[in-house]
Amino acid sequence: MENLSSSDQRRDFFVFVDPNDWLTRHQLALIGSFSSSPADASAPKLMFLPNPEFQTFISPFQNNLVRNYMAEYNLELCREQDFAHYPCRLQAIFLFDTEEETRKYLARHHNHVGGRLLKRCQTIGRYLWSRHDSSWIDFLRVGHSMDAETLQFVGRAYWSGDSVKNHQLTSMGKAWSEDPIMEVLLLGRIDFDDRGLTT
C-alpha cells in the first residue's frame, strides 16, 4: 500500500503535546519520548462495544457524547476487516509530516490543539506508519446519520489513504467538503530534542 511504510531510518515528524496533561509531562519532561502501544494483531483494540439490543430514543446529550467514539469504532471495524496490518488509531501516536499540515490542523481544530505545544520529534528504532486524510474523521463526526454502506465507504477511503477532495460528499442533503489534512499514525517510539513544556 502506498500510504503504509515500515522503517528503522530516523525520520522527523511534528506533534501537538498538551503541557498540562500528567502523562505528557511524565513522558516528555522525564523520559524525553513517547511510545505507542505495542503492535499486537491478536488483541482487541476497542474498550467499549455498542449494545446490540439498544433500540430506544437517543437524546441530544447522548448523541454528542458518543459521536466521536462511534467514528473511531466504525473506523476500527473497517481496519480489522480490511486493513489489519495498518496501525490502529486507538494505539498509534498521531503525527504530521510537515509544519504546513500542522498549521492547517490548528486552524480547523483550534479547540482541540489550541492550548498545546507543537514539537518536532524523531523516530527511534523500528516503526510502522501510515498516512491518512483526517478530513474523513471530520466527516464522520458531523451531526448526521450514515447508513452502513456510507460508513464502509468512508472507512475504506480513510484507510487506503484516499483524499476527501477526490469525492463529492453530502451531509443532510447539502454538499460537504474540506481541504485535506494529512495525518500520520505511527506505531513505535519518538524522541524529543526539546523537552521543554513552555512556549
Language model: regions and residue ranges:
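Conserved NAD+-utilizing ADP-ribose enzyme module
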Residues: E2-D12, D18-L65, Q91, E100-H112, ...
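Active-site-proximal specificity loops/subdomain of glycosyltransferases
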Residues: Q62-A84
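Intrinsically disordered, charged low-complexity linkers and terminal tails
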Residues: M1, A71-Y73, C88
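Short glycine-enriched loop/turn motifs at secondary-structure junctions
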Residues: A84-L90
